């Protein structure tokens, strides 16, 4: 009659058994984490922008560049926006942002100064959370990659004339630019509503941030 072998398993076999169970444990843990995340997202109130600050429309918060556009291009400005002031500024700002999104400007330009790649030396201090706490950043436009310069604090860096020339023919102001022409921002050589609006938006970016 045979005897029962009670000798311990070889060391390699005893170590292999827990390792064989590891993928199953990892799968179960992954599903548990997934369920927890779904439940938390389902029961947690997600911010819809109720507590964010809106761009302040009073005259003192409107960049000087907006009034300069009205002086430099009085006829198209009045035709499309009326007199320069809080109401026309809000309209231009909204249309400008919509144009920025529709034209894919966010694909080549960021609105976030990062702590890497020499960004602070080129564009100033690293972007902080409160800097984007306004309704114009819902949804955010941090960008997808950096082809052109960061625009997070573009306000006042360049003149309106520079932006007009740049949109009309980018290589006229930067021979190595890969940016396309935006001729549909103009009627003849003067900016139309989209042209005035997107320049207004760009000249606003960062104007609501106290520079230190």
Where are these regions (language model features)?
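Residue-level detector of secondary-structure transition/capping positions
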Residues: 104, 113-116, 171, 206
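Alpha-helical transmembrane signal-anchor/signal-peptide segments
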Residues: 44-65
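C-terminal capping alpha-helices of c-type cytochrome domains
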Residues: 18-43, 160-212
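The canonical Cys-X-X-Cys-His
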Residues: 96, 102-112, 163, 179, ...
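Gly/Gly-Pro-rich "capping" loops immediately C-terminal to redox-active cysteine motifs
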Residues: 77, 89, 97, 112-165, ...
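N-terminal positive-inside, membrane-proximal cytosolic segments immediately preceding the first
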Residues: 1-25
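Electrostatic cytochrome c docking/interface patches
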Residues: 65-101, 113-118, 212
């Amino acid at each position: 009659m045979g005897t029962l072998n009670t000798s311990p398993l070889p060391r390699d076999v005893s170590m292999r058994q827990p390792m064989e169970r590891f993928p199953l444990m990892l799968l179960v843990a992954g599903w548990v984490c997934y369920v927890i995340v779904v439940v938390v997202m389902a029961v947690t109130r997600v911010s819809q922008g109720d507590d964010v600050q809106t761009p302040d429309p009073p005259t003192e918060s409107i960049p000087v560049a907006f009034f300069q556009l009205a002086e430099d291009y009085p006829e198209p400005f009045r035709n499309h926006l009326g007199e320069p002031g809080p109401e026309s500024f809000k309209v231009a700002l909204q249309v400008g942002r919509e144009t920025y999104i529709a034209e894919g400007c966010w694909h080549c330009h960021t609105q976030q100064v990062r702590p890497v790649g020499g960004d602070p030396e080129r564009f100033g201090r690293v972007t902080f959370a409160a800097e984007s706490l306004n309704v114009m950043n819902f949804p955010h436009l941090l960008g997808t990659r950096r082809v052109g310069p960061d625009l997070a604090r573009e306000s006042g860096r360049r003149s309106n004339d520079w932006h007009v020339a740049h949109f009309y023919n980018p290589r006229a102001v930067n021979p190595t630019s890969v940016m396309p022409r935006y001729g549909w921002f103009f009627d003849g050589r003067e900016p139309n509503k989209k042209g005035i609006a997107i320049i207004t938006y760009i000249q606003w970016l960062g104007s609501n941030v106290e520079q230190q």
